Amino acid sequence: MPQTDAVDHVHRLLSCRLPARLRQCVVAVILCGLGPLAVQAQSGAGVSNPLSAVRASGGQLPSLGDNSALAAAAERRLGDRIAREIYRDPDYLDDAVLLEYVDRVWQPLLAASKARSEMSPEIEQRFAWEIMLGRDRTINAFALPGGYFGLHLGLIGVVSNRDELASVLAHEMSHVTQRHISRLISKQSEQTPWLIGAMILGVLAAGKNPEAANAVLAGGQAVAIQSQLNFSRDMEREADRVGFGVMTQGGFAPQGFVSMFDKLQQASRLNDNGSFPYLRSHPLTSERIADVQARQPPGPVVTLETTLEHAMVSARARVLSNSGADALRQYVAEASDPALASATPARQASVLYGAVLASEKTRDFAAARTLLARLDGLTRSTPQAQRLTNLLGAELALASGQPTPVLAAPGRPELLLSAQILTGQGRAAEASQALLSWVATHPRDASAWQLLAAASSAQGQLLRAIRADAEARVAQMDYAGALDRFKAGQTMVRNAGNAGVDHIEASIIDTRARAVQLLFREQSLER
């Protein structure tokens, strides 16, 4: 097999279609990172030279077939390293509306998995259980080490209801709770030190020169592990079985699993053109399809309807993942189709929502307001859909510079939008107060910290703005960047002397700088 094919096969380990630079780094981290991580986990000490650590361990990674299985703590550290790369990627998206909708599907699945004892207490506590959105229109979702999960907007855009989305998320969650990724990684215990060394060099090269990284990875003879990295058929069937149980116990309709399989099967029959990478990493087999169909409860087949809310969320995902000029014009044109009047309410809501958002993106605010009025009339009697209409209206008003009332609902989307509105209206103190209350209980919300930095700066509170900027970086595990900002705050305090210094804020910065310094040292030792 050509070396390039082998590298592509390695990429499919994580069922992930990432940008080339990030994909090379992630692959290298997966294939070599566990050498030093495993040594570190066993010794309790950091490892300053990963290549030396691999040589000291005989070049072997742990095997889950025996007692040297990859520890949950080591897997979480590996997941953190990958997540840090994803946070920095331009395709990473923190969209409050989409994330909230996905989280309302995700949380019942987590609760059901715990209730069924599918996850051990150790991984329940140690793993992140975090979903990260990718601005990619391909249909894909993937599990990463340490309880991180990726979800492409393309998948949100094609599922017809929350039950289909739940089936995919439950399947991916089950790959993690059943330790499939850990088992796959740990199979590589027989690789030679020179191969693992080449992969380590690939990590270093990926940060500076993607082409060099690709050459190093190919030169490392990745073909040696080609046949060992796919999820096995048994793993796929196990993820189906466990995921089905988690999904149904979580309150979702079992028909969602079947209808999602039908979508994937149709795509497979149509000779997938690359927009369904999920099919390549999770190939459908007749056994998988028959097994899921056999799990359906007896009785008539239930047809799952698309709610207005889901239709609007899917439309948002489609527009945000495909915002080229031609695509935006097409979204707007669909709203002018006379046949739309006879379509289902869900179809109308989807088209109108997408058209409003597309018009906003093209800065045709007059057209956007006209379309928004049509959407408002359609959704007024459905509270959840009306809420999405109100949020979209606030986004439009903010983008067009129109005065808009502050949103009062208590959700994260309202909070983040209201903070921007208040700051823009010269009411930054109110925005700061709301954001401070939020980050006190949600310290890993990088977007909230960034808005707090903007609100603090608008009030002339530069020291608080610097700290908020630093905390945003901490939330995404960019400890080097955070430490740089904390040090900038300390320098500001020293230069100001006692004149106008917020001593409480200065004390907080000193404390946080020391804590982040330790995190930065630990992070450096893992490289």
Ranges and model annotations:
Residues G150, E164-E172, V176, A218:
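Short alpha-helical catalytic segment bearing the HExxH-like zincin motif
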Residues A71, G150-S167, F231-D234:
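Short pre-active-site segment immediately N-terminal to the catalytic Zn-binding motif
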Residues D163-E164, M173-E190:
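Catalytic Zn2+-binding segment of zinc metalloproteases
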Residues P193-K208, A215-A224:
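Membrane-active amphipathic alpha-helices enriched in small hydrophobic residues
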Residues P2-T4, I30-F142, A267-R269, F365-R369, ...:
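Hydrophobic or amphipathic, alpha-helical segments that drive membrane association/targeting
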Residues S48-N49, G65-A69, Y92, E100, ...:
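Extracytoplasmic and endomembrane cell-envelope/extracellular-matrix remodeling and assembly machinery
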Residues P2-V26:
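Bacterial N-terminal signal peptides that target proteins for export
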Residues F149, V158, V176, G299, ...:
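TPR/TPR-like alpha-solenoid repeats
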